[in-house]
Swiss-Prot record:
Lineage: Eukaryota, Metazoa, Cnidaria, Anthozoa, Hexacorallia
Motif Cell attachment site, crucial for protein stability per record, residues: 179-181
GO terms of biological process kind: cytolysis in another organism; monoatomic cation transport; pore complex assembly
Function summary: Pore-forming protein that forms cations-selective hydrophilic pores of around 1 nm and causes cytolysis. Pore formation is a multi-step process that involves specific recognition of membrane sphingomyelin (but neither cholesterol nor phosphatidylcholine) using aromatic rich region and adjacent phosphocholine (POC) binding site, firm binding to the membrane (mainly driven by hydrophobic interactions) accompanied by the transfer of the N-terminal region to the lipid-water interface and finally pore formation after oligomerization of monomers.
Cell compartment(s), UniProt: Secreted; Nematocyst; Target cell membrane
Stretches for region Plays an important role in the hemolytic activity: 38-47
Subunit structure: Octamer or nonamer in membranes. Monomer in the soluble state.
Source organism: Actinia equina
Residues marked Interacts with the lipid membrane (site): 179, 195
The protein's name in its UniProt record: DELTA-actitoxin-Aeq1c
Length: 214
């Protein structure tokens, strides 16, 4: 009888030890889900990217006259890895989300420089795609609407390229950007991909882009 009791105790201890890692994995998954909220710098499910989510990101920036919330949905079948952000005007306190798997969307923001300065929020995001090429996203929210308008663009560059002044000029001046006109625009990007995006026309802007298989 005593041997049976000992065997029972040993088996119970083994089962308990086996259950602990599983619980830890579940806890980590729950933490990841909690991190996937509507804040700049987060990665969320692609299907969850909506105007309401971007408005939440925008609101978190506070009372700033020139600001933007950016959401880019990855339905490309590829994984994206952040390279950098180049700001032509303005800034952001957010680190560009590092990894964006297929089926997920990144959230980011930008704003005018702090203080009484006449600047907008203008920049380019660059992501290395798992096929070896670079996805680039332009956003432009100007300070002076007497002379300028909102503009955006999304393009794929061959090979690996970091965002810089030259990339900004290509996207803004030469590669047919879209005006932020409160409407949706579509474009074939090449490499078997296409895009669909929306940007509003105001100084507190949202930019929603979906990159999908063509």
């Amino acid at each position: 009888m005593s041997r049976l009791i000992i065997v029972f105790i040993v088996v119970s201890m083994i089962c308990s030890a086996t259950a602990l890692p599983s619980k830890k994995i579940i806890d980590e998954d729950e933490k990841d889900e909690k991190r996937s909220v509507a804040v700049a710098g987060a990665i969320i499910k692609g299907a969850a990217l909506t105007f309401n989510v971007l408005q939440t990101v925008l609101k978190a920036l506070g009372d700033i006259s020139r600001k933007i919330a950016v959401g880019v949905d990855n339905e490309s079948g590829k994984t994206w890895t952040a390279l950098n952000t180049y700001f032509r005007s303005g800034t952001s306190d957010i680190v560009l989300p590092h990894k964006v798997p297929h089926g997920k969307a990144l959230l980011y923001n930008g704003q005018k420089d702090r203080g009484p300065v006449a600047t907008g929020a203008v920049g380019v995001l660059a992501y290395a795609m798992s096929d070896g090429n670079t996805l680039a996203v332009l956003f432009s929210v100007p300070y002076d609407y007497n002379w300028y308008s909102n503009w955006w663009n999304v393009r794929i560059f061959k090979g690996r390229r970091r965002a810089d002044q030259r990339m900004y000029e290509q996207l803004y001046y030469y590669l047919s950007p879209f005006r932020g006109d409160n409407g949706w625009h579509e474009r074939h990007l090449g490499y078997g991909l296409k895009s669909r995006g929306f940007m509003n026309s105001g100084g507190q802007a949202i930019l929603e882009i979906h990159v999908t298989k063509a």
